[in-house]
């Protein structure tokens, strides 16, 4: 821990209430307690869990009851209850998951840019942390992938103090003593230090009976160049473990029994795993503080201690606790999976989707280890039913959640079918490092223990070990958003540097999005880059391309604006040539209105389509990218499979309904905190803008999201919409391309021209294409059937009609078949006998294409190499190869014979 002045922790509250500062005899950490005899900090591993033996006044509390008791207590103490945010941190551009309650307020509230939604406030925030995923179950409840962090926060400004350390500690004491009924002498405040996100401060860990029930952090420093600089905004950042409070009051054998109640027994039953004795579990839990997950040997030692204490066989204890831990892992993981999917996660091979897929696959792997063939979605369904009142989004998105989990299980099974092939390719190595295993999992998703098992069947000597915390290592690599590559700037560096010393450009396009022309004064001229004091030219941003148009000077010179770009708040007009202008000159500007108007249509319709897609496909749909040009619009959305034609029609019809319904479209400038509280984090579908205020585009009773682009004032101006292309561009991302307004007519004409050309090729009219095509396909089918009959006849005679020769005990068949399907079947049939080679030679221009197939007991490698030495190009290995050569047929055959004579 950082060396901190003792006065940071020497609070008036402690001194006035007869608390003593002690040094733990085990860990040497200072802590505060009213118990004068206490010499140990009451935290694991300094002690075992002994809260089971403490007498408290509170009745057993479920998770829901513990949550409500906490919220209501702090509401009585003047805190405003605010709703939690989703478990996907979409208001953050650097983080995928909500890992703590303070994340809800980062970066804008904590940096002082915007005020908090209330001050002080209280909430219970569901959180997900995956770096300790391998420890879940093994520690019987100390580690969970999903948990609720109940928290009260106070934001202290220089001119407005709410409360600080003394009040925070006193509130915790009152909650634990008055609401939970813990004897005050059992409370311990362990001195600690917190750092995260560039901030730091002293903290207290509240420990009782071996269990850490809360952490009280006082965020008061900013870390700059390794130094601690006092913050102007000082934040009380607390975290109370809701699940731990429930366990503390229920005193169940493990935390999982307290969190999940009867669902524990349901899971054992459905998985087909025999129940584990409660006394064994409770003893294991009491001693679980001795487990250090970073030291796997402590797990073995823990089980030895449990066996000794109960007088049981170690093998039996190990077997029982392993089974229990695995069932608890499935319990934990399925809840986390349900919460992730309910908040809109789409499993994929990147981003937040990667973390979701990792957890699904880990749950599936654990089920295999338990020998269970139950479908994972059946267990997730149980979680939805159990938690539906606490998290209504689970029930609302139930169909999506179950559909995705089922699909992911199918994909996982497909992945496992490739394990032998992957193992074979890796078995030639002498060693596989942990980093290699992580990279392999990233690329193919095969559980490392299964992969290593297969590799060792082929190469028992290979050096490879799967670390105990493998999945945690993988999760850690993916838990934060990688730093985005520096955007490929469209402006040269000298122009970007120029912007540093220029004033912001007034944005006339926000005052009136229909404004076509304007007058302005020149602020800067550099080469063909022009900066004005104000402009109606929209600079490229948010997927909308920059405006073009003209600029005229007072002398009558006209300059074409070929592009518009922005550096921070300075707008650059890129001209077709260097202008004869100087600072202070007045100019006239006019945008290419037809072009801009088409872009506006494609931009507004993008918002219409996104909302339509969410309504048709589900609330998990999120914008993954977009582009708006005069020619068309493009929207990339998160979705787990390619939409059906019926779904695309529904999206298109719904969007056209909104267009024809003449919905008003208006921009709103609103405080960020107010916007989030009123509309939720979906306002960030197009990205997270900076600043205290956000600009929203509202389509009446349809859609509202943050956007800095130019828009129509009514959906009717869009005219019409046609989706022209739908494709899967990457795992979990679907691309929609569409046209709007008068571009729809252009697109229709192009399609009409294609139809006319097709009808011309079929010698019929456009009206008769369907009839003609049907007849054509029937004729094609008849001819295909006839061709198949000829193929069968040829195959029956292939051995007789091919040139056959025996060389060095090997039978060589020389054939010349142009029909690809017939050729493949012939080569397969002729190589069924041992020691046989088939050579198909076909002419292609000035070259001969040679295909070679061998029976399973021979290889083509040497033959291919011999033909390559003669100038051939191609390759092959095993039983098949192909090469292109200028050799004539006789020379090809002789080269092959010679190679066989020398032995292949």
UniProtKB/Swiss-Prot annotation:
SUPFAM superfamilies given for it?
Answer: Class II aaRS and biotin synthetases, Putative anticodon-binding domain of alanyl-tRNA synthetase (AlaRS), ThrRS/AlaRS common domain, Translation proteins
Keywords assigned by UniProt, alphabetized: Aminoacyl-tRNA synthetase, ATP-binding, Cytoplasm, Ligase, Metal-binding, Nucleotide-binding, Protein biosynthesis, RNA-binding, tRNA-binding, Zinc
UniProt KW Cell membrane keyword: no
Gene Ontology biological-process entries: alanyl-tRNA aminoacylation
Q: What class of enzyme is it?
A: ligase
Q: Which SMART domains match?
A: tRNA_SAD
Q: Which cofactor does it need?
A: Zn(2+)
Which Pfam family, an example, fits this chain?
Answer: tRNA_SAD
UniProt GO molecular function = alanine-tRNA ligase activity; aminoacyl-tRNA deacylase activity; ATP binding; tRNA binding; zinc ion binding
Q: Which NCBIfam families does the UniProt entry name for this protein?
A: A-tRNA_syn_arch, alaS
Domain notes per entry: Consists of three domains; the N-terminal catalytic domain, the editing domain and the C-terminal C-Ala domain. The editing domain removes incorrectly charged amino acids, while the C-Ala domain, along with tRNA(Ala), serves as a bridge to cooperatively bring together the editing and aminoacylation centers thus stimulating deacylation of misacylated tRNAs.
State the family it belongs to. Answer: Belongs to the class-II aminoacyl-tRNA synthetase family.
Its annotated function is as follows: Catalyzes the attachment of alanine to tRNA(Ala) in a two-step reaction: alanine is first activated by ATP to form Ala-AMP and then transferred to the acceptor end of tRNA(Ala). Also edits incorrectly charged Ser-tRNA(Ala) and Gly-tRNA(Ala) via its editing domain.
Q: What protein am I looking at? A: Alanine--tRNA ligase
Gene of this entry: alaS
